[in-house]
């Protein structure tokens, strides 16, 4: 085998190992046919924060668009009016998701909710103790399991699953109010998602302030519900100011909800 052939073989074998490593951390779309020039960004994404962009829908066709802070700032006022901002897209630790620009509200403008379902076993929703809780990113699936199991139920005076229901009911914009209906499938974040929000809280708040020009959108010193179950009595909550993950009684305590969606 010539030196040139040996080099080509080594490069191919190295690429195969890189592909396996990237697939192992969640990048199923990476294959041997992927460009190697893409790998450095994926490695950065796997190990920390890759980027944050404003997630928008174009009014003319409801298509999804994403802009960096610089790209959004470069648009003329007329061009900005062609889009409705849906939320902030975050790509970090192999996870791509969009965080809602504001908290969920209940009737009467309350921002606090029960989790619901005290004492009830939710089929398919596994219990997450302290270790596994940090790597749980099944928020969308878990939210649906919660809704299906608790629909029409009443537990200790709490009907259904208020926190999960608030998350899926969230709308970034509506046909009546904005001329376009938000069809995003919002859900209650998992504990892993909330830890990302805590870890990059300052950067997230900076971007929320830049894109929405309002401090009312910011992540603040509050406890937020997650969709991550601890047991039949408690679920995980996260204080995004301190990073404290605390199990709280599902029907005794009322906490805030910040919906997210898959990118």
Regions found by a protein language model. Give the residues of each.
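Short, compositionally biased
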Residues: 1-182, 251-263
């Amino acid at each position: 085998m010539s030196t040139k052939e040996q080099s080509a073989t080594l490069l191919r074998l190295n690429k195969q190992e890189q592909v396996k490593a990237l697939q192992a951390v969640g990048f199923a779309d990476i294959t041997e046919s992927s460009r190697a020039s893409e790998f450095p960004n994926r490695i950065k994404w796997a190990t920390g924060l890759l980027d944050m962009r404003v997630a928008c829908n174009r009014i003319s066709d409801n298509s999804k668009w994403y802009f960096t802070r610089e790209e959004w700032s470069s648009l003329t006022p007329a061009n900005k009016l062609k889009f409705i901002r849906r939320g902030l897209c975050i790509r970090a630790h192999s996870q791509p998701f969009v965080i809602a620009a504001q908290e969920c509200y209940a009737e009467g403008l309350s921002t606090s909710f029960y989790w619901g379902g005290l004492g009830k076993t939710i089929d398919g929703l596994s219990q997450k103790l302290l270790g596994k809780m940090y790597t749980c990113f099944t928020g969308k699936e878990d939210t649906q399991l919660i809704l299906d199991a608790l629909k029409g139920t009443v537990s200790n005076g709490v009907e259904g699953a208020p926190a999960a229901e608030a998350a899926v009911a969230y709308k970034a914009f509506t046909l009546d109010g904005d001329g376009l209906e938000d069809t995003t499938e919002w859900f209650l974040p998992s504990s892993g998602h909330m830890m990302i929000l805590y870890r990059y809280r300052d950067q997230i708040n900076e971007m929320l302030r830049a894109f929405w020009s309002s401090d009312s959108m910011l992540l603040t010193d509050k406890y937020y519900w997650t969709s991550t179950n601890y047991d039949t009595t408690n679920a995980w909550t996260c204080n995004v100011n301190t990073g404290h993950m605390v199990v709280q009684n599902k029907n005794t305590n009322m906490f805030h909800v910040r919906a997210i969606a898959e990118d």
